[in-house]
């Protein structure tokens, strides 16, 4: 019972606190470079899993399957999912800048669509007709959620935000497909794979920040743009609470990853997907309670269709007359 509570609490905290951080950091408009800094924080949280990995190595002894024995080329190959994660996470943080926390989280439900498409085309898996029907409900639900956001005053630029999140899901689905491919031929603890990805992510994001700031962000044309990191850092110095929020998010990301991996191992990926639905609902409720957004019937309808599609896809519930 403790693991689901940890996963739900940390998962809700990640999104709500990130959106709250955006809202108190912005001045006349969102600080664009905040998206990259938040991505760096995500990878720092993933890299913190090394503490968990080292604990498991010590507690389980010589029988623990480590990545240390792998050839260098295999370790380098693990940078590929990290690169996909960088693209996906940064785009999603851009989306969170411009739309509400609940619409951001609901739009993330489109991930299952891209994962299914890649599973059939790249991993050569077969998806049944009823599962494709389930995905059509997911598509319809995401479309309604997106329309409810674009047709209301939710966020400063909801169309840009929703588009960024959707493109981000494509990159994350690519990441998940590569991870599944890696884990299919390498017997290794998934937590160590995430720790490696976090380390690669920190390295590549920092390298990208240095290069992009030098050539773009520090120029007159890049002033207060996507790569002007001095802008967001100066804002952090003006509002010290932003540092505290980043620290809490970093810790919650580490707890979310550890608890999620443990739940997948002890129960199933389906259980984890159920908790992710509960996470989405929790984010929506808390965002409304905090006055960050209001109730929209169309958004609720889209959310219901999204849940129905995901539940039927995982066979948690069945379509009427499906067995007849």
Curated annotation (Swiss-Prot):
Transmembrane segment boundaries: 34-54, 76-96, 103-123, 127-147, 158-178, 198-218, 243-263, 275-295, 297-317
Q: Does the keyword Cytoplasm apply?
A: no
Q: Kindly give the membrane topology term recorded for this protein.
A: Multi-pass membrane protein
Protein name listed in UniProt: Uncharacterized protein C12G12.12
Q: Which UniProt keywords apply?
A: Membrane, Transmembrane, Transmembrane helix
Q: Which InterPro entries match?
A: Nuc_sug_transpt, UCP036436
What's a GO biological-process term for it? UDP-galactose transmembrane import into Golgi lumen
Recorded source organism is: Schizosaccharomyces pombe (strain 972 / ATCC 24843) (Fission yeast)
SUPFAM superfamilies given in the database record: Multidrug resistance efflux transporter EmrE
- Membrane as a keyword of this entry, yes or no, is yes
State the GO CC annotations.
Golgi membrane; intracellular membrane-bounded organelle; membrane
Q: Which GO terms describe its molecular function?
A: UDP-galactose transmembrane transporter activity
Where in the cell does this protein reside?
Membrane
């Amino acid at each position: 019972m403790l693991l689901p509570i940890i996963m739900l609490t940390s998962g809700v905290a990640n999104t709500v606190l990130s959106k709250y951080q955006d809202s108190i950091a912005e001045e006349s408009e969102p600080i664009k470079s905040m998206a990259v800094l938040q991505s760096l924080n995500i990878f720092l949280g993933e890299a913190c899993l090394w503490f968990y990995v080292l604990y498991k190595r010590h507690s389980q002894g010589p029988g623990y399957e480590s990545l240390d024995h792998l050839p260098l080329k295999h370790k380098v190959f693990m940078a590929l999912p990290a690169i996909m994660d960088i693209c996906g996470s940064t785009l999603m943080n851009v989306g969170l800048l411009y739309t509400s926390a609940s619409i951001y989280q609901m739009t993330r439900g489109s991930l299952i669509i891209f994962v299914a498409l890649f599973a059939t085309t790249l991993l050569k898996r077969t998806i049944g007709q009823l599962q494709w029907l389930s995905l059509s409900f997911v598509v319809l639900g995401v479309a309604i959620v997106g329309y409810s956001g674009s047709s209301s005053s939710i966020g400063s630029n909801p169309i840009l935000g929703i588009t960024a999140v959707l493109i981000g899901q494509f990159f994350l689905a690519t990441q998940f497909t590569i991870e599944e491919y890696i884990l299919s031929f390498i017997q290794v603890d998934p937590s160590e794979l995430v720790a490696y990805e976090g380390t690669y992510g920190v390295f590549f994001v920092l390298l990208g920040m240095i290069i992009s700031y030098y050539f773009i962000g520090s120029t007159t044309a890049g002033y207060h743009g996507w790569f002007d990191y001095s802008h967001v850092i100066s804002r952090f110095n003006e509002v010290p609470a932003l540092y505290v929020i980043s620290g809490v998010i970093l810790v919650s990301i580490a707890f979310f990853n550890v608890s999620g991996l443990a739940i997948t191992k002890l129960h199933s990926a389906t259980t984890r997907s159920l908790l992710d639905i509960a996470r989405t609902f929790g984010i929506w409720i808390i965002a409304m309670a905090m006055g960050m957004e209001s109730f929209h019937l169309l958004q609720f309808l889209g959310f219901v269709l999204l849940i129905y599609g995901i539940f039927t896809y995982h066979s948690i519930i069945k379509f009427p007359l499906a067995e007849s």
